[in-house]
Each structure stands twice: as C-alpha cells, then as structure tokens.
C-alpha cells in the first residue's frame, strides 16, 4: 500500500474537524472503507496498509494517520465473527487509557466487512527480543521488566479488570526512536474480564469447573484446576514468565500427548509437581519468595503490590544495578513493521517506572494468535479443552519482527 498518495475522499469536511491526534475517538463508525482511488480507510483519517500479523481475532494491519503522517496499528475483526471481542477490548482500552505502558486507542468503527480498532504502533514484543538475545535474559533485564510489569498489572487491577493473557508476546517495548521506547507496554485485552461487578461493586464469586483461559505455559496452577481467575492468577503467570526469561525455558515445555486435553493436564501436573525451590534453583531467593507469596493468595485477596515491587527493587539495588533501561537488546538492530532500526543506549539513568502521559508517537503491535515453535497452543489455550475447534493459521509474518511462521493447527479463541 503506497502511503505517499493522498487518501481521496478520506479527507472529508467532517474528518477535518476531527482531532488531528486521535482522528475520531468514537465507537460509532463514520462511513469508512474504500475511496474513489481504491484506498481502504478507517474513519476519516486512517489509511489501511499492509498486513503485519494475524490470529483468530482477524488480522493486524499497518496504518497511517493522514493528518499527522504518523504510523498506527489497525486491528481488524470480521463483523460476522462467531465470537466478537474487539468492541469489548476497545472499551477496556478506553478504561485504561492515559497512563504509561498502555497503548492509546484512537478510533473504533466499521471498515468494510470488518470492525476496526486503531491504536498506537509499538516496537517488538518481549518474545521477539528474547529470540534476539539468544533466548536468555540477564537478571538485570528481568528485574527491570518485572518491576514495570508489576506496576502495569496493578494499574489494570485498579480499573476492576483482570488480564488473563500473560505471555511475552503481549508485552512490547515502545517504538524505537520515541521518548518511551524503553518502557514495557501491555497489550491485547481480548481475554480481560471485570472482576468487580459494575452494578453491585462486589468481587465476582469463586467458581470451579471453568474453561482454560490464557496460555498454558504461563497460566497459574489454579487456572489449570478449573478455578475462576482473580488478581492472584495474573501475578502468578507473571512469575512463571520471569522464570522463563531467566532459565531460557520452563520444565513443562515440550511435553507430548495424544490430545490437547491430555497435554494441558500434563502441563498442569508438571507445574504442581515442580517445587518452587527447584524452579528457581540457582537464581536469587527473591524469585522463589515472589512465587510462594502469589500462590498463597486467597481468591478475593488484594495482592500487596508494593511488597512484590520492593522484593525486586531491593534485589536490584543490592546487585549494584542502575535502572538505566539498558536492556540486553540495547544497541541491537530491531526489525519493525516500518523498517529495521537500531536501539539507542539510554543517554542517562531515568527514574523508575512513573505514570506519565503517553507520547503520541508510541504504538501497538499484537502477536496474539501467533504460535511459539515449541508450544502449539500458545495464545489459544483459552478454548474449552472438552470442545476444541480447529482453525488454520495462515503462513504469516510475526507482527513485530517479521519472523516467518509455518502453517499450524490452533485452537479457536472463545469468550
């Protein structure tokens, strides 16, 4: 898609009245899609470009705001989707907007046969960066990630939401070259859920025999057991991801089974059978302390986020590290949807993760729906294990770094 040509009828009088930054932040779509020049538009401002990712939600496109000349991400979901979730995700983004580490949402509306959500364009995911760093992160990098993500998850929880989709593909750095290129962002709220009832203002009830929701590799033990998720489960899944980064892999990866149901069972059984001390062996005691704490939380209990953050900030300081955002990937070339760029080393130490307004140049990429090479259910293990629905994930480039993926069978995402 040639972005240098004008968008024809896309620049309407109504469009010119829209905010140049957001371009029409409305849940009611203005007449969109094709123009006389054959250019596909979302709303009056956003031109749709090349595909940069796909999944069971639909597909992700690179876009451009014709008024600001800035790139955006456009998430498309078929209007006739059997399990529509994009409008709910848009609502959750609106609830969470205006804080650091959450991409800004610009627009929601129809685009031909699709519903479209326009968001900021971000840089690579932590999974992409993990690959770039030979699949191991140093303690310093993991602690800088962990301190930020505890803060992100705390913020999500303060907005009455639980996330339920922890995996490295859903945490992205800012777009290289922007002010917040070193901040870790949380994306993809398609599986998020309100844990505080909006009418009664009470915590959702404890339930059992629930379908699996999330990614099997990282999900909590209680999720494997079919228990309703709450705040504790998001934090436990983060702990599993932190150990994945430190170890390079987890003991329950690569397990073989005849059916997906059996495989999920094996993963859950192995998690329960792996003592925390063994999982965290040869790593600082704080990693084990974190997991012991979150696994002991009650379903209704509010986690002590300050305690968990302090565990890691104290370890960080004792180790003599400086919170300078000099991650393991600093200085390496980072492929992005708009070309390869080199990350700059931070010019000076910055303050630890503080809530600030977004830089309007930041961005969103979602690898939701992509498959990890050794985990054919990654990103899809939310489907009821008793009724798997197979879909074909087409050969597609990975959203952030354009790594080729082969065709694989995956589970249909369900609400």
From Swiss-Prot:
Residues 369-415 are annotated as: Phospho-regulated basic and hydrophobic (PRBH) motif. Keywords: ATP-binding, Cytoplasm, Kinase, Nucleotide-binding, Phosphoprotein, Serine/threonine-protein kinase, Transferase, Wnt signaling pathway. GO terms for cellular component: cell cortex; cytoplasm; cytosol; membrane; nucleus; plasma membrane. Residues 358-370 have a biased composition (Polar residues). Residues 46-316 form the Protein kinase domain. Residues 1-36, 340-383 are annotated as: Disordered. GO terms for biological process: endocytosis; positive regulation of canonical Wnt signaling pathway; protein phosphorylation; signal transduction; sphingolipid biosynthetic process; Wnt signaling pathway. GO terms for molecular function: ATP binding; protein serine kinase activity; protein serine/threonine kinase activity. Residues 1-17 have a biased composition (Basic and acidic residues). SUPFAM superfamilies: Protein kinase-like (PK-like) (SSF56112). The keyword Nucleotide-binding applies. ATP binds at residues 52-60, 75. The active site is at 165 (proton acceptor). Autophosphorylated. Phosphorylated by aPKC which promotes dissociation from the cell cortex. Stimulated by estrogen. Repressed by 5-iodotubercidin (DB04604). It catalyses: L-seryl-[protein] + ATP = O-phospho-L-seryl-[protein] + ADP + H(+); L-threonyl-[protein] + ATP = O-phospho-L-threonyl-[protein] + ADP + H(+). Belongs to the protein kinase superfamily. CK1 Ser/Thr protein kinase family. Casein kinase I subfamily. This is Casein kinase I isoform gamma-2.
